């Protein structure tokens, strides 16, 4: 089967990261690749794309993936496309493959009755955001990987679909006008379709299996790709549809059970996503055993580490309970220094580590307030995006730092102002390192019990009303 692959790429820095390169090189074994990027590539990246693909085209960042596909088809032309038996439209939001693609292409080539097929499907749901005027999202193949075959590929219907397609101005318009429409549009014309990954048994469980249970799809259903967005999707959205562990179990599986360079993907994401989003999805928090014997203080300098004590902020001091818990957390952290230092040997990408924020609610509120106060001064000092919420470290006036992550030498950057402490995790992120916190087993158990209590109270109207009353009373006192 002669196959053409249109690979859509976008990166605000003009880079083609490792995840894109691995995907393109793997797909190039199964067809000719037309690489199209919404933006200007760096010279080295442009040279790489030109060396491994049939065509490399750069365009204005307009119309998202739909705009790129539409332009690619116009450039290729109907006559040239007539030479191919199958067209694959694929975009950079997929990472992988974690296994050979031979099984997928062989399985789908054995199904000549299909006019088009895709990697995965999304099940029907109601959505004002993505459902357009009707608010209904039908079951559909997901647009991150769509394969269209002759004779549909060469038909007037296919070309009219793209010629009449308006350029979307937003992600929501792209989903509503193309992804959720493509499958139904051609199915209504009598075309047969299917997804390679079989998730029919999950129809009543998850509407979007590749995001909700990616490890299951990779480990047990032969899916060769996963979504890079798994590692930075808003965590509140995850909790509305899953138990919140999908990203971490995906990461552990890919790292431990495959040869895919997932840490290189993570390093690229650290340059482009807020640290706190990655930290929440990947649960960069370690639990140290309570009963572990106190070990001698490690030789930190020999490990390329440094211990940094930071003063308690004025906001933390304002609440006496917060100040007490913060001082206690710092004191206990000193006792666990050897265990904390050992984590750096285990995790080569770990840059900054600190005790977890105390479970006392005012402590977290104080830390959030400190971050918001420091955030304006941090803008422009680092070349990574700043999230609305603080990174996991530093906290509790204590941080263990990998010198190479924050300084690139054997000296620490000077800390002369409160915002300088926040620069530690941000500089580490800029250099490709993540930050994390550690907690005791007792704190971890207490956090689980607190969560259970919050769920219980959230389901009780009386408890909600009581909490609302307390909040109003507290605000009035201020």
Predicted regions and their residues:
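ER/Golgi luminal nucleotide-sugar-dependent glycosyltransferases, focusing on the catalytic module
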Residues: 1-478
């Amino acid at each position: 089967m002669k196959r053409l692959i249109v690979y859509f790429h976008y990166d605000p820095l003009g880079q083609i990261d490792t995840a894109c390169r691995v995907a393109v090189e793997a797909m190039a074994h199964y067809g000719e690749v037309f690489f199209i990027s919404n933006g200007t590539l760096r010279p080295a990246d442009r040279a790489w794309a030109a060396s491994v693909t049939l065509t490399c085209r750069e365009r204005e960042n307009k119309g998202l993936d739909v705009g790129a596909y539409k332009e690619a088809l116009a450039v290729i032309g109907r006559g040239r496309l007539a030479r191919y038996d199958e067209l694959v439209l694929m975009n950079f939001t997929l990472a992988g493959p974690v296994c050979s693609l031979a099984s997928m292409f062989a399985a789908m080539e054995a199904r000549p009755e299909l006019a088009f097929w895709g990697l995965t499907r999304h099940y029907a749901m109601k959505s004002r955001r993505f459902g357009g005027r009707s608010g209904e999202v039908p079951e559909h193949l997901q647009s991150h990987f769509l394969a269209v075959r002759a004779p549909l590929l060469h038909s007037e219907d296919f070309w009219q679909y793209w010629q009449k397609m308006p350029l979307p101005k937003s992600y929501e318009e792209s989903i509503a006008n193309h992804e959720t429409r493509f499958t139904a549009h051609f199915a209504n014309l009598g075309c047969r379709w299917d997804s390679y990954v079989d998730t029919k048994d999950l129809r009543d469980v998850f509407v979007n299996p590749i995001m909700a249970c990616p490890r299951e799809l990779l480990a047990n259903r032969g899916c060769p790709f996963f979504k890079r967005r798994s590692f930075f999707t808003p965590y509140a959205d995850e909790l509305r549809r899953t138990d919140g562990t999908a990203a971490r179990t995906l990461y552990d599986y890919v790292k431990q059970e495959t040869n895919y360079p997932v840490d290189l993907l993570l390093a690229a994401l650290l340059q482009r996503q807020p640290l706190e989003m990655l930290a929440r999805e990947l649960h960069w928090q370690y639990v140290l055993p309570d009963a572990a014997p106190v070990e001698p203080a490690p030789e930190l300098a020999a490990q390329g580490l440094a211990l940094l004590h930071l003063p308690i902020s004025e906001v933390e001091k304002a609440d006496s309970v917060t100040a007490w818990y913060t001082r206690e957390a710092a004191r206990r952290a000193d006792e666990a220094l050897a265990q904390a230092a050992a984590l750096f040997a285990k995790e080569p990408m770990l840059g900054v580590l600190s005790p977890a924020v105390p479970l006392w609610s005012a402590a977290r509120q104080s830390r959030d307030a400190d971050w918001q106060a420091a955030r304006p001064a941090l803008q422009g000092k680092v070349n990574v995006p700043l999230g609305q919420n603080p990174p996991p470290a530093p906290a509790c006036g204590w941080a263990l730092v990998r010198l190479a992550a924050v300084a690139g030498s054997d000296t620490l950057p000077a800390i002369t102002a409160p915002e300088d402490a926040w620069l530690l995790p941000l500089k580490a992120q800029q250099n490709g390192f993540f930050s994390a916190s550690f907690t005791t087993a007792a704190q971890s158990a207490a956090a689980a019990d607190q969560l259970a209590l919050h769920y219980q109270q959230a389901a009780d109207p009386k408890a909600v009303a009581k909490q609302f009353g307390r909040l109003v009373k507290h605000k009035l006192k201020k």
